UniProtKB/Swiss-Prot annotation:
GO terms for biological process: regulation of cell shape. Residues 318-351 are annotated as: Disordered. The keyword Transcription does not apply. It comes from the Bacteria. The keyword Zinc does not apply. GO terms for cellular component: plasma membrane. Belongs to the MreC family. InterPro entries: Cell/Rod_1, Cell/Rod_MreC_2, MreC, MreC_beta-barrel_core. This is Cell shape-determining protein MreC.
Amino acid sequence: MKPIFGKAPPLGIRLLIAIFASIALILADGRNSSITKARSAMETAIGGLYYLANSPRSILDGISENLVDTNKLQIENKVLRQQLLEKNADLLLLDQLKVENQRLRLLLNSPLRTDEYKKIAEVLTAETDIYRQQIVINQGKKDGAYVGQPVIDEKGVIGQIISVGENTSRVLLLTDVTHSIPVQVLRNDVRVIASGTGHTDELSLDNVPRSVDIEKGDLLVTSGLGGRFLEGYPVAVVQSVSRDSSNYFAIVKAKPLALLERLRYVLLLWPSNLDISKVKSISPEEVRNLVQKRLESQANEANYRVKKTPLTEKDFLENEEKTIIEPDIPTDFLQNEEDLPIEQQEERIED
């Protein structure tokens, strides 16, 4: 069967035809504006194809950028979280240091006498069971600590040193069952002996006749009897008084002012002259005035309004319960009753 179309022209002829056609179009484009309009229309028509052909690349680039941004944001978020944790830890440490600094400042201001040498000690260990109430501090013989030395904190009397090592010392707390301390009621100077019960929040007053004027809320301070311990440092507050007509002695319980179960820093006291018997005594009126100033100072530290009338022991207890940081209350040393002369022990019982 004979083909419809004849044989195609040779390649050379087709090339010449294309060349002449191109030259003709170039000449026509420069002289005829209709060719320009036709070319513009064609470019407009195929412009959408350019966008369509480029869309996969745009989509892939967008996905890649989103993945990079997400990964970058996750890394930045992790870094920021870590920085936030570090800043929070620094803030907590700063708050702790502020509280600690406040406690140390109150501790250093607690002695009643300006002629007393004082030194801060840190509590290393504590034994506060019913049979033993003792702590170990980081001050020893090389630091000048000695057996019988008074130990206080910013709120009240802690106890006394009973043994001294080269670098550490053991302190007997005033709530230990083997410990007793001579005290007096700040309100009326009634003198009694306060003994430990084995509980960190309780003292017992020994041999108190039921006729003695002592009431719940009375503030007990060191009496200084025996010439060994200085007077005027707060020790405890009377919590309960039970009188029975069938018993000659009243049952009196008191609560130590110092928080013995939460001790961290304590203060060791030295008189300017180690011969305490030669230290000038403070009169009861001076003791009351000094302690009154301490109570008012404590109220001011806790941002409480100071009353126009003198603060009472009840006011002190209320402020103590509301204050977060321990108030600026002076404290002094403790003494076992058996350390005193027999005559003075009998004198206390009679009082």
